Amino acid sequence: MPGLTIGDTVPNLELDSTHGKIRIHDYVGNGYVILFSHPGDFTPVCTTELAAMANYAKEFEKRGVKLLGISCDDVQSHKEWTKDIEAYKPGSKVTYPIMADPDRSAIKQLNMVDPDEKDAEGQLPSRTLHIVGPDKKVKLSFLYPSCTGRNMDEVVRAVDSLLTAAKHKVATPANWNPGECVVIAPGVSDDEAKKMFPQGFETADLPSKKGYLRFTKV
């Protein structure tokens, strides 16, 4: 069966967490949620990642985005491990919930399984991160192996891109950062673009002369 991917609705699972029972759709509500998995508690890369998430929590909060972690460890393990996370990065308070999936059924439904990483109980979660929108659908996914920690600056940049695209009906080019030019979707005619973007736009002069690469500011 194909795994959860961009455009799919996230299963409305209910799981125990460090903040009590959580039903995913209720947690998403009318906003955006970063739903991320880690292979295991009390492991080195995961400790640095969840500390980084805690460090960046205010950046996500400013954008109206909530965090939600998950792994196959139990709630008590998550709570004990949180002490290590916060000690590793003093000032990094883990305020977001971490869900428990001891039977690993949720990580399978969320397409968060690492086929190459196992323990005595079975396959472990990968470093998967889904950005879920208000419609409960996956807007973007990152998938990393256990050996590679995530880059939080790129997660923030991806969130900014999604929010900008949703608000202004544009797309963001390679290496884009907030404040830089965005591109106009090819389905928008020049006449429509003039109405949508009264500030104007520039069309790149390319050999094909197709006029499809148009930049504007929002």
From Swiss-Prot:
It comes from Triticum aestivum. Thiol-specific peroxidase that catalyzes the reduction of hydrogen peroxide and organic hydroperoxides to water and alcohols, respectively. Seems to contribute to the inhibition of germination during stress. Residues 4-164 form the Thioredoxin domain. This is 1-Cys peroxiredoxin PER1. Pfam families: 1-cysPrx_C, AhpC-TSA. One of its GO terms (cellular component) is nucleus. A motif (Bipartite nuclear localization signal) lies at residues 194-217. The active site is at residue 46.
